[in-house]
Amino acid sequence: MIEPQMSVVVPVYSVEKEYFEECILSLKQQTLEAIEIIIVADGVKKEILDLCKSFEGQDERIRVVEQENQGVAVARNNGILNAKAPYITFVDADDWVEPEFCAFFYDNLKIIQMCRLYLRQHI
C-alpha cells in the first residue's frame, strides 16, 4: 500500500445503504490515490456494519473503526486518532464527492505549508 497523504474520515450511524455505497464509491475513485478511507461505524445496525466490512475487504485503503454509538463528534475524533496521513478531511456517509476532491485540498495544503486548517464549501 502507498503511504497515505490524506485521511478521509467517514462517520457512519444511520444512513441509507444506496447513499453510503455512492459515498464510498466516490472516495475510491479519487484522482489522489494516496488516501486512506477511515469508516467510523458509530453503533450502526448489522446490515450497515457488514457493508462497511465488505468495503474494507475490497480496498486496502479502507479501514473500519467500530465504536458504540457516541455521536458524530466522537466518531470524527476517533477517526482523527486512527488517521495515518498528514492531512485529514471529513465526508458525511450520505454525501458523494467529485473525483478531484482530495487532490484539490492536498495540492492547496502543500502550497500553503503553514496552513493548519483549510475550509471550502461547495454545493
Task: Cite the ranges covered by each PLM segment.
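Nucleotide-sugar donor-binding/catalytic module of glycosyltransferases
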Residues: M1-I123
